[in-house]
Amino acid sequence: LGAVEASRPIPWKTEEPLWVSQWPLSSEKLEAVTRLVQEQERLGHLEPSTSPWNTPIFVIKKKSGKWRLLHDLRAINNQMHLFGPVQRGLPLLSALPQDWKLIIIDIKDCFFSIPLYPRDRPRFAFTIPSLNHMEPDKRFQWKVLPQGMANSPTICQLYVQEALEPIRKQFTSLIVIHYMDDILICHKELDVLQKAFPMLVAELKQWGLEIASEKVQIADTGLFLGSKITPKNIVPQKIEIRKDHLQTLNDFQKLLGDINWLRPFLKIPSADLKPLFDLLEGEPHISSPRKFTPAAHRALQMVEEALQEAQITTNSPAKIIDWYPDAVAQPRSRIKAAVTHFGRDPDSLIVPYTAAQVQTLAATSSDWAVLVTSFSGQIDNHFPKHPILQFALNQAIVFPQVTAKDPLPDGTVVYTDGSKTGLGAYVVKDRVISKQYNETSPQVVECLIVLEVLEAFPGPLNIVSDSSYVVNAVNLLEIAGIIRSSSRVANIFQKIQAALLNRRFPVFITHVRAHSGLPGPMSLGNDLADKATKLVATALSTHAQAAKEFHKRFHVTAETLRRRFALSRKEAREIVTQCQNCCEFLPTPHMGINPRGIRPLQMWQMDVTHIPSFGRLQYVHVSVDTCSGVMFATPLTGEKASYVIQHCLEAWSAWGKPRIKTDNGPAYTSQKFRQFCRQMDVTHLTGLPYNPQGQGIVERAHRTLKSYLIKQKGSIEDVLPSVPRVAVSMALFTLNFLNCDAQGHTAADRHSLEPDRPKEMVKWKDVLTDLWKGPDPILIRSRGAVCVFPQEEENPLWIPERLTRRAPSQLQNKKDGGQVGDEDSPTRDDGSYDGRVTVGHHVYLPPTDASDAECPGVPIFHK
């Protein structure tokens, strides 16, 4: 094998030997095991063993008739510390330079070419049972990385990386991409590649790694990691649209809606897709049958070919690349993000079999054998200890089947829509019925109109809606259990649920893309419902229509529309964002988009994250102050309301009693927690059910806390015990009391320190009325602007610095020697601004990862 000295030891949790007995094997399987083990021993992969460790083996027959040896290493995996990920995603192949030459190789039997650390080999021993105990059992242990060992992929990646390191150092201009056992080398000059390739083969051979000669690709085009690399582009190997499920009008409507949405990107003229669109014509019922015509098949093949040719171009060396600091690049993350894929198995698998039955199944069934060796988690047969689950185990429960999964051929077809003006409408057989509601959310209005339809049509029913929110909610409500009154839509959901459960006939609800421009009865019905809400909405909202016309002419800001036409901020902003001329100039959303408090304790976000390595204390409850950035976390044994209350009491006793915002988890919406908040006089807010609002700040806090737990692991074990509570306390101490921002303040400083001066009062000029107003207090100063809180307004306003003047009483204090602020105030005597930033009240964006910690939070100012 060679390179044994470079093999990597595995960290173990215990030195206690583990023995899992080998189960009996049939004569046929025993013969196959003996033959396979002899072959592996001859190749140097196995050696005889007298180890006190043992785990079972078995064999499965492949489709080709050959046998495959499997080793059940789940028990051994539980005894080892898992290595962290060393390569968390696939390399981005479009980063390869254009027109460079390639050599692609594949390492043959990579795992079996890498030696196992000698001291670790006894742990991977197994037994070949003798028939009828006629002789001592033969025992062997692996000398190479075994299949199924949890750390084998990581050790393989690190081992191959070390083997490639001399080539990387010797040929610095050579691009070397390595992923598991696949290697790609790339260079502009073919001569350099031809010189590097034999040295690469020789270096790999010194490490005991052999390349598969039949898989070597030497050209400017090749297949690598599921993609085809050409001199100019990266293309997928094969794309085909699934067609076997396309049978009804509803099926084709969904497919063609997506194709029509993608058509401009694929640069396909709509005339070329007319045979496909013609399939939507005819019988109007959504369950009416549809079949492909030869012309439609050709049109769909055109779409598949266009998808196949939708290539990613490789990197041109002559192209100028703009580099941005991390904080600046965040708004461009959608555009400049790398293609990265992550995956994670569940921690446990619940099956209706005992441990002995699972072992029997693994010994007799090939499918079970593959499962138990490939699944790294725990296989159990105990459901969580929950009263509802225990009741379901003891009592036969039949879930209602009112909401159908397929269109109902004999059902009435109804199209629904709702608008923000409170107007809802539904269309049945070209007849439009409208109804006005006292709501401003389109989703809520559409929920109400769907409820109206459910009550008006008791027979078989097909509902078509352009709101994914409503479609998903209706499909979930039938088996959602008890809905607690945690928001203003809970009552509507309760009524929809009751209407579904009381129905004798089934109902089918489906989604259709709005404003698709496609032909056919489904698009026509949706357009009729949509126009019904818009026509009446125009008559009901003359102010909004006038504002649209005014903006269409002058393209003024949303704030101007709000003041001039007495609109809400939401209405004014929608007019601006829907303008085709203005949309490309709108500011990009940034990291501070989540609602934040403008002072400590004004808004906390709270959530639960899971850290499996903590064992029973894996449920870590986290709270973060959205103003100061102070974080508090409590590792507990559950996430019920009682644990949430325990976390709240500990957090509030340390940092004060806040207003809190959470998601709609069962613990947060429970009667027990609501009663607790009332008793403690704490305001608790949640988002809409089935439509959770952003909890981005606390989600980033989860990531930050976990990163510090990883970074600080082992740093305090020589002083303090390595237990979850100590680890969490150490991380919180660092985040709250050590990490500083640009002003030298920690999160604890920002949370506890109050301004040592009174609010500065200024008079300010309203540009619309040309009148001076105030004096009013300043909350925040920024470069060229101040945030003023008018006493007669509901919210603060941003005013240009040049349109403000210090209040007369404060000017007099200034002349008399009194200090309105301090000697470093950035405002001159004439009311102008000297360019420095001072703080009336800062709202900080706390550091969330390593990059933020190097350049900690800048102030985020909110209106």
Curated annotation (Swiss-Prot):
| The family this protein is said to belong to | Belongs to the retroviral Pol polyprotein family.
Which segments constitute the RNase H type-1 domain?
Answer: 408-538
Q: Which reaction does it catalyse?
A: DNA(n) + a 2'-deoxyribonucleoside 5'-triphosphate = DNA(n+1) + diphosphate; Endonucleolytic cleavage to 5'-phosphomonoester
Keywords, comma-separated and alphabetical: DNA integration, DNA recombination, DNA-binding, Endonuclease, Hydrolase, Magnesium, Metal-binding, Multifunctional enzyme, Nuclease, Nucleotidyltransferase, RNA-directed DNA polymerase, Transferase, Transposable element, Viral genome integration, Virus entry into host cell, Zinc, Zinc-finger
The domain of life for this entry's organism is Viruses
Q: Which GO terms describe its molecular function?
A: DNA binding; DNA-directed DNA polymerase activity; RNA stem-loop binding; RNA-directed DNA polymerase activity; RNA-DNA hybrid ribonuclease activity; zinc ion binding
Zinc fingers (Integrase-type), renumbered ranges: 542-583
The species this protein belongs to is: Hamster intracisternal a-particle H18 (IAP-H18)
> Which co-factors does it depend on?
Mg(2+)
* Annotated site location: Cleavage: A546, A547
Q: What is this protein called?
A: Intracisternal A-particle Pol-related polyprotein
One family name in Pfam for this protein = RVT_1
Which InterPro entries does this entry report, sorted A to Z?
A: DNA/RNA_pol_sf, Integrase-like_N, Integrase_C_dom_sf_retrovir, Integrase_C_retrovir, Integrase_cat-core, Integrase_Zn-bd_dom_N, Rev_trsase/Diguanyl_cyclase, RNaseH-like_sf
Domain (Reverse transcriptase): give its ranges: 41-229
EC number(s) recorded for this UniProt protein? 2.7.7.49, 2.7.7.7, 3.1.26.4
Query: Zinc-finger as a keyword?
Result: yes
Residues the entry annotates as binding Mg(2+) 2: D417, E446, D466, D530
State the disulfide connectivity. Answer: none
Q: Which residues bind DNA?
A: 760-809
The record's free-text note on cofactor binding: The RT polymerase active site binds 2 magnesium ions.
Q: What is an annotated GO biological process for this record, any one?
A: establishment of integrated proviral latency
Q: Where does Mg(2+) 1 bind?
A: D106, D181, D182
